[in-house]
Amino acid sequence: KPNFIRF
């Protein structure tokens, strides 16, 4: 699964 930053 892709990594992404959650704000």
Curated annotation (Swiss-Prot):
This is FMRFamide-like neuropeptide PF4. Signal peptide: none annotated. GO terms for cellular component: extracellular region. The keyword DNA damage does not apply. Keywords: Amidation, Neuropeptide, Secreted. Belongs to the FARP (FMRFamide related peptide) family. It comes from Panagrellus redivivus (Microworm). It comes from the Eukaryota.
